């Protein structure tokens, strides 16, 4: 009770100081008692905004989520997209039911009608949503000595989930995980934010069954399906056999070309001509004028 009383007195002192300061300086002050608000999805919440030092205040509320900006309240009036579930009062705005799309930063902006006086305050709203069942991507087979990346993700949790990995039912995220017998000869890193499990390099001890878990501090932690990964040796014998087969085929091709050339096949092809029509012309015998007879003959 004593702690709550001290906090209340401190809050009252801060608020009083802001009011007195605004009166002395002739400037308006805008204040909120809740700069960071968390509320479960589908419940109601009021975002408060208190101001002083404005003779004729005009209040606006702005919503920012990433690169998206929207007006919730303009000139003390709720805008159309929010009209069915948000109400305005001089002390703030009230959501009748929030969804995960309402996550973001809300700014209360107060100004004079003439624009000579201005103040603002921001409130970060987090809509609490438990994580859904995560999905994983695990290669069924990886070569020892190579790099392997296993991924885990879910897209419903708010705030965003953090991820942990398990191999054969043993947690890999604990500080002493690499000191245990199961992971002593393994080289891996885990990014709890992205959900990536990276082996670099893969060792023979990394074969096993893997699954991940997602949790965000709200609701129940969710576990993925399990998937098996095999760490296999590089198939040197197969590579050597493939190279030998390639060399044999190349040798046979070279021998075939040499054999055809040695038998004169290419020379005959180059010098030979396709059989065609032959024309034989014989000189006509001397005859008297007027007696003409064709004596040319054509052989085909």
Curated annotation (Swiss-Prot):
It is a single-pass type I membrane protein. Its main location: other. Belongs to the immunoglobulin superfamily. This is Junctional adhesion molecule A. The chain crosses the membrane at residues 239-259. InterPro entries: F11R, Ig-like_dom, Ig-like_dom_sf, Ig-like_fold, Ig_sub, Ig_sub2, Ig_V-set. Seems to play a role in epithelial tight junction formation. Appears early in primordial forms of cell junctions and recruits PARD3. The association of the PARD6-PARD3 complex may prevent the interaction of PARD3 with JAM1, thereby preventing tight junction assembly. Plays a role in regulating monocyte transmigration involved in integrity of epithelial barrier. Ligand for integrin alpha-L/beta-2 involved in memory T-cell and neutrophil transmigration. Involved in platelet activation. Interacts with the ninth PDZ domain of MPDZ. Interacts with the first PDZ domain of PARD3. The association between PARD3 and PARD6B probably disrupts this interaction. Interacts with ITGAL (via I-domain). Interacts with CD151. PANTHER family: JUNCTIONAL ADHESION MOLECULE A. Keywords: Cell junction, Cell membrane, Disulfide bond, Glycoprotein, Immunoglobulin domain, Membrane, Phosphoprotein, Repeat, Signal, Tight junction, Transmembrane, Transmembrane helix. Pfam families: Ig_3, V-set. Residues 260-299 are cytoplasmic. One of its GO terms (biological process) is establishment of endothelial intestinal barrier. Residues 28-122, 134-230 form the Ig-like V-type domain. Residues 27-238 are extracellular. Residues 1-26 form the signal peptide. It comes from Mus musculus. The gene is F11r. Glycans are attached at residues 42, 185. The Ig-like V-type 2 domain is necessary and sufficient for interaction with integrin alpha-L/beta-2.
């Amino acid at each position: 009770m004593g702690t709550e009383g001290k906090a209340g007195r401190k809050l009252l002192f801060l608020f009083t100081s802001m009011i007195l300061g605004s009166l002395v300086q002739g400037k308006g002050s805008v204040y909120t008692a809740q700069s960071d608000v968390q509320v479960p999805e589908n419940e109601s919440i009021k975002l408060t905004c208190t101001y002083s030092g404005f003779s004729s205040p005009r209040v606006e509320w702005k919503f920012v989520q990433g690169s998206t900006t929207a007006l919730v309240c303009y000139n003390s009036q709720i805008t159309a997209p929010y009209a069915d579930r948000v109400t305005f009062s001089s002390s703030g705005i009230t959501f009748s039911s929030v969804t995960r799309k309402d996550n973001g930063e809300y700014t209360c902006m107060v100004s004079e009608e003439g624009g000579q006086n201005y103040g603002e305050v921001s409130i970060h709203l987090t809509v609490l949503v438990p994580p859904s069942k995560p999905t994983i991507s695990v290669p069924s087979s990886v070569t020892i000595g190579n790099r392997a990346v296993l991924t885990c993700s879910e897209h419903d949790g708010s705030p965003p989930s953090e991820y942990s990995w398990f191999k054969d039912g043993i947690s890999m995220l604990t500080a002493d995980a690499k000191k245990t017998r199961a992971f002593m000869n393994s080289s891996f890193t885990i990014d709890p934010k992205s959900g990536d499990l990276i082996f670099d390099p893969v060792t023979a001890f990394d074969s096993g069954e893997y699954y991940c878990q997602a949790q965000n501090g709200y609701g129940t932690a969710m576990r993925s399906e399990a998937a098996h990964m095999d760490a296999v040796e590089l198939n040197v014998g197969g590579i050597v056999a493939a190279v030998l087969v390639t060399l044999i085929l190349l040798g046979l091709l070279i021998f075939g070309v040499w054999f055809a050339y040695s038998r004169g096949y290419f020379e005959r092809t180059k010098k030979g001509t396709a059989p065609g029509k032959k024309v034989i012309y014989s000189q006509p015998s001397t005859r008297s004028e007027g007696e003409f007879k064709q004596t040319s003959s054509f052989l085909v």
